[in-house]
Amino acid sequence: MAEKFIKHTGLVVPLDAANVDTDAIIPKQFLQKVTRTGFGAHLFNDWRFLDEKGQQPNPDFVLNFPQYQGASILLARENFGCGSSREHAPWALTDYGFKVVIAPSFADIFYGNSFNNQLLPVKLSDAEVDELFALVKANPGIHFDVDLEAQEVKVGEKTYRFTIDAFRRHCMMNGLDSIGLTLQHDDAIASYEAKQPAFMN
Protein backbone atom coordinates (compact mmCIF):
# COMPACT_ATOMS: atom_id res chain seq x y z
CA MET A 1 0.00 0.00 0.00
CA ALA A 2 1.05 3.57 -0.64
CA GLU A 3 1.33 6.26 2.01
CA LYS A 4 -2.05 7.65 3.07
CA PHE A 5 -2.76 11.29 2.27
CA ILE A 6 -5.28 13.01 4.52
CA LYS A 7 -3.74 16.33 5.53
CA HIS A 8 -0.47 18.02 4.71
CA THR A 9 1.16 21.23 5.90
CA GLY A 10 4.13 22.32 3.86
CA LEU A 11 6.40 25.06 2.60
CA VAL A 12 5.25 26.50 -0.72
CA VAL A 13 7.47 27.29 -3.70
CA PRO A 14 6.05 29.44 -6.54
CA LEU A 15 6.85 28.29 -10.08
CA ASP A 16 5.42 31.19 -12.05
CA ALA A 17 5.19 29.51 -15.44
CA ALA A 18 2.29 28.23 -17.54
CA ASN A 19 2.32 25.13 -19.75
CA VAL A 20 5.12 23.41 -17.85
CA ASP A 21 5.52 20.20 -19.83
CA THR A 22 6.73 16.78 -18.76
CA ASP A 23 10.03 17.20 -20.60
CA ALA A 24 10.75 20.24 -18.44
CA ILE A 25 9.70 18.34 -15.32
CA ILE A 26 11.97 15.38 -16.10
CA PRO A 27 14.01 15.53 -19.35
CA LYS A 28 13.95 12.47 -21.59
CA GLN A 29 17.61 11.56 -21.06
CA PHE A 30 16.79 10.57 -17.47
CA LEU A 31 13.97 8.13 -18.27
CA GLN A 32 15.98 4.92 -18.58
CA LYS A 33 15.10 3.62 -15.12
CA VAL A 34 11.81 1.87 -14.40
CA THR A 35 11.94 2.19 -10.61
CA ARG A 36 10.33 5.23 -9.02
CA THR A 37 13.33 6.46 -7.06
CA GLY A 38 16.21 8.70 -8.02
CA PHE A 39 14.31 11.01 -10.36
CA GLY A 40 14.14 13.88 -7.89
CA ALA A 41 17.80 14.67 -8.54
CA HIS A 42 16.86 15.53 -12.12
CA LEU A 43 13.58 17.37 -11.49
CA PHE A 44 13.47 20.49 -13.70
CA ASN A 45 17.06 19.59 -14.61
CA ASP A 46 17.42 22.04 -17.50
CA TRP A 47 16.12 24.88 -15.32
CA ARG A 48 17.76 23.97 -12.02
CA PHE A 49 21.26 23.53 -13.41
CA LEU A 50 23.56 25.45 -15.73
CA ASP A 51 25.36 22.31 -16.92
CA GLU A 52 24.05 19.08 -18.45
CA LYS A 53 25.40 16.89 -15.64
CA GLY A 54 23.48 18.75 -12.93
CA GLN A 55 26.56 19.85 -11.01
CA GLN A 56 26.18 23.64 -11.23
CA PRO A 57 22.92 25.00 -9.72
CA ASN A 58 21.24 27.88 -11.51
CA PRO A 59 21.02 30.65 -8.88
CA ASP A 60 18.14 32.29 -10.76
CA PHE A 61 15.81 29.27 -10.61
CA VAL A 62 13.27 29.40 -7.82
CA LEU A 63 13.83 25.85 -6.51
CA ASN A 64 17.42 26.83 -5.76
CA PHE A 65 16.50 29.85 -3.63
CA PRO A 66 17.46 29.25 0.03
CA GLN A 67 14.03 30.25 1.34
CA TYR A 68 12.34 27.45 -0.61
CA GLN A 69 14.59 24.55 0.38
CA GLY A 70 12.47 21.71 1.70
CA ALA A 71 9.31 22.86 -0.09
CA SER A 72 6.64 20.19 -0.40
CA ILE A 73 3.90 22.21 -2.12
CA LEU A 74 4.41 23.49 -5.66
CA LEU A 75 2.34 26.45 -6.83
CA ALA A 76 2.13 26.66 -10.62
CA ARG A 77 0.16 28.13 -13.50
CA GLU A 78 -2.31 26.63 -15.97
CA ASN A 79 -1.88 23.43 -17.99
CA PHE A 80 0.77 21.98 -15.68
CA GLY A 81 2.15 18.62 -16.82
CA CYS A 82 1.32 18.97 -20.52
CA GLY A 83 3.34 17.35 -23.29
CA SER A 84 4.26 13.71 -23.72
CA SER A 85 2.82 11.08 -21.42
CA ARG A 86 5.36 9.93 -18.85
CA GLU A 87 4.66 8.67 -15.35
CA HIS A 88 8.22 9.68 -14.53
CA ALA A 89 6.96 13.27 -14.10
CA PRO A 90 5.03 12.63 -10.87
CA TRP A 91 7.79 10.20 -9.83
CA ALA A 92 10.32 13.04 -10.08
CA LEU A 93 8.09 15.47 -8.17
CA THR A 94 7.39 13.05 -5.32
CA ASP A 95 10.99 11.84 -5.17
CA TYR A 96 12.10 15.46 -4.79
CA GLY A 97 9.68 15.82 -1.88
CA PHE A 98 6.53 17.37 -3.31
CA LYS A 99 3.20 16.19 -1.91
CA VAL A 100 0.90 18.74 -3.56
CA VAL A 101 0.79 20.74 -6.79
CA ILE A 102 -1.65 23.66 -6.95
CA ALA A 103 -2.57 25.10 -10.35
CA PRO A 104 -5.61 26.35 -12.29
CA SER A 105 -5.49 23.30 -14.60
CA PHE A 106 -3.50 20.17 -15.36
CA ALA A 107 -2.94 18.04 -18.44
CA ASP A 108 -5.32 15.07 -18.22
CA ILE A 109 -2.73 12.27 -18.27
CA PHE A 110 -0.48 13.99 -15.74
CA TYR A 111 -3.53 14.59 -13.53
CA GLY A 112 -4.41 10.89 -13.49
CA ASN A 113 -0.81 9.78 -13.02
CA SER A 114 -0.48 12.08 -10.02
CA PHE A 115 -3.21 10.29 -8.10
CA ASN A 116 -1.62 6.94 -8.95
CA ASN A 117 1.54 8.17 -7.23
CA GLN A 118 0.08 9.91 -4.15
CA LEU A 119 0.78 13.38 -5.53
CA LEU A 120 -2.26 15.59 -4.93
CA PRO A 121 -3.10 17.91 -7.86
CA VAL A 122 -5.29 20.74 -6.57
CA LYS A 123 -7.26 22.82 -9.05
CA LEU A 124 -8.14 26.36 -8.02
CA SER A 125 -9.44 29.24 -10.12
CA ASP A 126 -7.09 31.59 -11.95
CA ALA A 127 -8.03 34.37 -9.56
CA GLU A 128 -7.33 32.21 -6.50
CA VAL A 129 -3.97 31.09 -7.89
CA ASP A 130 -3.09 34.73 -8.64
CA GLU A 131 -3.91 35.55 -5.03
CA LEU A 132 -1.75 32.69 -3.74
CA PHE A 133 1.20 33.74 -5.89
CA ALA A 134 0.95 37.24 -4.45
CA LEU A 135 0.83 35.82 -0.91
CA VAL A 136 3.84 33.56 -1.42
CA LYS A 137 5.92 36.27 -3.04
CA ALA A 138 5.08 38.71 -0.25
CA ASN A 139 5.75 36.07 2.43
CA PRO A 140 8.64 33.79 1.38
CA GLY A 141 8.62 30.73 3.59
CA ILE A 142 4.84 30.69 3.99
CA HIS A 143 3.18 27.32 4.64
CA PHE A 144 -0.18 26.09 3.35
CA ASP A 145 -2.45 23.58 5.09
CA VAL A 146 -3.97 21.14 2.60
CA ASP A 147 -6.85 19.01 3.86
CA LEU A 148 -7.94 16.34 1.39
CA GLU A 149 -10.74 15.10 3.63
CA ALA A 150 -12.31 18.58 3.82
CA GLN A 151 -11.08 19.47 0.30
CA GLU A 152 -9.63 22.75 1.50
CA VAL A 153 -6.41 24.74 1.30
CA LYS A 154 -5.95 27.03 4.29
CA VAL A 155 -3.62 30.00 4.29
CA GLY A 156 -3.87 31.91 7.54
CA GLU A 157 -7.53 32.85 7.99
CA LYS A 158 -8.38 32.29 4.32
CA THR A 159 -9.80 29.03 2.98
CA TYR A 160 -9.79 27.88 -0.64
CA ARG A 161 -12.11 25.05 -1.63
CA PHE A 162 -11.28 22.40 -4.21
CA THR A 163 -13.03 19.28 -5.47
CA ILE A 164 -11.57 15.82 -6.03
CA ASP A 165 -13.43 12.88 -7.57
CA ALA A 166 -14.79 10.72 -4.72
CA PHE A 167 -13.05 7.53 -5.90
CA ARG A 168 -9.64 9.18 -6.26
CA ARG A 169 -10.08 10.91 -2.92
CA HIS A 170 -10.89 7.56 -1.27
CA CYS A 171 -7.82 5.94 -2.82
CA MET A 172 -5.44 8.69 -1.70
CA MET A 173 -6.85 8.86 1.81
CA ASN A 174 -6.48 5.10 2.18
CA GLY A 175 -3.12 4.77 0.44
CA LEU A 176 -4.54 2.61 -2.34
CA ASP A 177 -2.70 2.33 -5.64
CA SER A 178 -3.81 -0.06 -8.40
CA ILE A 179 -2.20 -3.01 -6.60
CA GLY A 180 -3.79 -2.05 -3.31
CA LEU A 181 -7.20 -1.81 -4.97
CA THR A 182 -6.77 -5.31 -6.40
CA LEU A 183 -5.70 -6.72 -3.03
CA GLN A 184 -8.89 -5.36 -1.46
CA HIS A 185 -10.71 -8.01 -3.51
CA ASP A 186 -8.23 -10.81 -2.82
CA ASP A 187 -10.85 -13.11 -1.26
CA ALA A 188 -13.26 -12.66 -4.17
CA ILE A 189 -10.48 -13.31 -6.68
CA ALA A 190 -9.39 -16.45 -4.82
CA SER A 191 -12.99 -17.68 -4.66
CA TYR A 192 -13.47 -17.12 -8.39
CA GLU A 193 -10.23 -18.90 -9.25
CA ALA A 194 -11.16 -21.85 -7.04
CA LYS A 195 -14.34 -22.37 -9.08
CA GLN A 196 -12.54 -22.54 -12.41
CA PRO A 197 -11.92 -25.91 -14.10
CA ALA A 198 -8.49 -27.37 -13.46
CA PHE A 199 -7.43 -26.99 -17.10
CA MET A 200 -7.87 -23.21 -16.79
CA ASN A 201 -5.44 -22.93 -13.87
Swiss-Prot record:
GO BP term, example: L-leucine biosynthetic process
Q: Which reaction does it catalyse?
A: (2R,3S)-3-isopropylmalate = (2S)-2-isopropylmalate
| A Pfam family recorded for this sequence | Aconitase_C
MF GO annotations: 3-isopropylmalate dehydratase activity
Role: Catalyzes the isomerization between 2-isopropylmalate and 3-isopropylmalate, via the formation of 2-isopropylmaleate.
The similarity comment for this entry is: Belongs to the LeuD family. LeuD type 1 subfamily.
Name recorded for this polypeptide: 3-isopropylmalate dehydratase small subunit
Q: Which organism is it from?
A: Escherichia fergusonii (strain ATCC 35469 / DSM 13698 / CCUG 18766 / IAM 14443 / JCM 21226 / LMG 7866 / NBRC 102419 / NCTC 12128 / CDC 0568-73)
